Amino acid sequence: MKEPKDNEVRRSEFIDAAEKLFRENGIVDTTVNSIVKELDVAKGLFYYYFKSKDDVIEAISEKYNRDFKQAIQRSLDPSNDFEERLNGFLENTIVSFRTLWDNLQGKNETIDLTILSTRSLEEAKQTASEKLTELLKEGNELKRMNIPNPEYFSKMIVSGIADLAGHAESDLREIKKMIDELIGKAGK
């Protein structure tokens, strides 16, 4: 008989197994039965942790976004000056979106992870936009820039970062350079 596991450990195992199967087979073609078979557990155990396959999709999205938030938060250390925080934030955001896109790729181009990618990307864009808005408002208050509408500007910048980071051929340094130029031009 198998040893019982801690609830969080077991829940994480379900999330990891579902994530693996989604990447291999797509979300539509991955069933609850295939997830429990992957873990060699009873189907009822799945339903102890999740109401449905959609709950697992949401849990994976939450995991990705928790990682995304932690990555960009590291650059917002209040002991750093404004320019260091802005540059660090932009660099971490670009890398974090690339990582998120990498996580949202199936084993081949026919694998459809649209449900998961839409949820994850929208939440990540919202988080990054809110943080960038705060930074731009601070830059305006410090007279380091003059961005007329920080909220709209942030949404535009973050959407561009998210889109460009999703293309494997995109050079992350080039994305950062373009963003710096846009902020520099808009902030005059």
Which residues are covered by each model-predicted region?
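Hydrophobic alpha-helical connector segments
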Residues: 59, 70-99, 153-157
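Membrane-interface starts of transmembrane alpha-helices
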Residues: 146, 150-154
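Hydrophobic/aromatic residues within well-ordered alpha-helical segments
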Residues: 10, 53, 60, 64-68, ...
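N-terminal intrinsically disordered/low-complexity leader segments
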Residues: 1-9
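Short secondary-structure transition hinges
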Residues: 92-133, 141, 162
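Helix-turn-helix
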Residues: 13, 21-55, 59
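Short coil/turn segments at alpha/beta junctions that flank glycine-rich nucleotide-binding fingerprints
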Residues: 24-28, 79, 100, 142
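C-terminal peripheral helix-coil segments that are non-catalytic and often amphipathic
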Residues: 1, 88, 95, 130-144, ...
